[in-house]
Every structure is written in C-alpha cells, then in structure tokens.
A protein has these predicted regions:
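Small-molecule-sensing regulatory modules
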Residues: 1-125
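Signature of uroporphyrinogen-III synthase
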Residues: 104-316
Length: 316
C-alpha cells in the first residue's frame, strides 16, 4: 500500500492472511543483541523545568535506565552512536547483570562476540572443577523412548537435542528450546525452531507471553517419572538411569568448584560426597537454580548461563 492511499479492505485481508502463513522465528538475544537502549523512550526538557522532571521521576523505571547507561557506556569506546554495527544488551538474572555484545569493531574491522558478567564477585580460580571434561562426564544414561503423547499441533519446549524419532516433532505447531545449543542440534535434524529461552530459564520470559501470539498451552519434553515440578505440562521421551563412570567419580572427589547442569546430577552427587554442600557451587539461572537454592543459600550459589562461562571464570 502506498502512503496516503485509502486502504482496500479486501486486499488488506488477503495480505494479512498470506502474512500469517509465514513461520515466525524470534532470534536469541545471546546471538543477536539489540541496539543499545533499544525500547527506551527518550524525552528532552529544559533544565529549569522542575514540573516535568518530577513527573518523569515518578514514571521512570530506574533499573531499565541504569541498564541503558551500561549499554551506551559500552559503545563509548568506539565513540558511541547509532551508526555502529554493534548490538549490546544487558540482562539481569538473580541480581547478576550480564552484558552481551556482538558486532564489528570500527577500529580493527573485525567481528566479535562478547559476554561479560558485570556485577560478578571476584572469584579465586581453582585448578580442579567439576565437570572437568564434558566429553568424558557421565552421571546418567538416557534410554530414548517413544513420546508419551501425540505431538500433533502442540506447542513444545525442547530441553534436549536427542530423540528416538524426529518426524513426530515436525507435526508440532510451535517449537521453543531451552537454549541455543539445543536449537542447533535439532535444527540439524531439519526442525524449524521458532524461539529459545536462551538459557535464562523457564520463568524469565514465559513462552506464552513473549514468544507466541496465541496464549495456548506449551508442553515440555522431558524424561519419564520426572518428580520435579514444571510450570508446563510434560511429555516424556526418555528414561534417566543413574550410571556414573570412573572418570566422573574421580573428578567428583577431586574438585573444588562445581557446576550443575541439572538438579538430578546435584542430588546424586551430594549422596556420594555430602561435603559438596560446603564447597563452591554454580548452575544456570533456571529450574536447577530454583531447586538447588533451597539447599544451598543463594548468596553461596553462583549463576552462569552455561558451562563454558563457568569454566572461563573459575578454572585456573
């Protein structure tokens, strides 16, 4: 439609119908950070306009304003400005601010991808972490099985990338993943992913409020007889069988700092080595954090978006 012309309602309905046929994909903020201060409303007023200043102070969201300052400050090293080919976003998880930036350095002309834990407490690095090697790490075996319910036209939250059958997943209406690694794994099997929780956890930005137009039910794919509560109804597709190998046992009793990728692993580990509760522990910001923080005080539990970040900050 040309600007200023009267809208043909018949053509508009046809356009809307065709537009809705497109698959909607919301890209992850960890890979595609937004422009600095994106979404914040700026307003100019005179220095002596006290009335306007008082009104703005009443409605201003101070936490968001502070995040905007951090994002703009990050761009200052290149002179700032909207013309920079750099995205930067600050997110807050359990009182820990994380800055994610990606783009092209105007000085070196090279592309970069950076993640910084801004409010990170200084941590003394150690020589022995758990797990020390993800390739050799094993606390459970997963026995893949058929889906416990039909997936046709359902909205799904995928937490793992391995499945006994892929075709049933292609019949789903909408697919979200718990993180970007799961997204990449299932995408290799020909699945179109519509969005991801980005490793921030199920409660950070609920799927039905942020990632879907229709507030219809979402089902979480998980393991059978999962006794831990989820905000989503579940569909099982594998069994979790305790099976800890020799490398992991040795690593478990040698480690000084621990990163937990699931509460199940944490629960099994403290049965084998109870003094882990007095050691340094860390995990992601989602359900694992929520469950472990009921056992270990939150102030003693570090939060990292993934294992690689934990390794970067805690391994000497």
């Amino acid at each position: 439609f040309k600007y200023g012309e009267k809208v043909d309602q018949k053509e508009f309905k046809r356009f809307k119908y065709l537009f809705n046929e497109f698959e909607k994909i919301i890209l992850p903020i960890s890979e595609f950070p937004s422009a600095a201060a994106q979404g914040c409303i700026a307003l100019e007023y005179r220095n002596d306009d006290i009335k306007t200043q008082r009104i703005l102070k009443k409605i201003n969201h101070v936490a968001s304003l502070n995040d905007c300052f951090l994002e703009r400050k990050y761009l200052a090293k290149w002179g700032g400005g909207c013309s920079l080919d750099i995205g930067v976003t600050v997110e807050e998880l359990h009182n820990k601010k994380i800055l994610i930036a990606k783009g092209k350095d105007t000085f070196t002309k090279k592309y970069f991808h950076e993640k910084k834990y801004i409010s990170d407490v200084k941590i003394k690095k150690v020589r022995n972490i758990f797990p020390s090697n993800l390739g050799k790490y094993q606390m459970f075996k997963r026995s893949l099985s058929d889906f416990s319910k039909k997936l046709d036209n359902k909205n799904l939250l995928l937490t793992r990338g391995e499945y006994k059958e892929i075709p049933p997943l292609k019949k789903a209406s909408n697919i979200s993943t718990s993180g970007t690694s799961t997204w990449k794994k299932v995408n290799k099997n020909g699945l179109l992913v519509n969005s991801t929780l980005d490793g921030f956890g199920e409660n950070y930005r609920p799927i039905e409020l942020y990632y879907k137009r229709k507030k219809t039910l979402t089902y979480k794919l998980t393991y059978g007889k999962n006794k831990f509560k989820s905000k989503y109804p579940t569909i099982s597709h594998y069994k979790l069988i305790p099976s800890i190998n020799e490398f992991t046992i040795d690593n478990l009793f040698l480690a000084e700092s621990f990163y937990w990728m699931s509460f199940s692993a944490f629960e099994l580990a403290i049965k084998l080595r109870p003094d882990i509760l007095n050691k340094r522990n860390a995990c992601g910001p989602g359900n694992t954090y929520r469950k472990i923080s009921k056992i270990i005080p939150k102030k003693q539990l570090n939060v990292y978006l993934n294992y690689e970040d934990f390794k970067k900050y805690e391994l000497k």
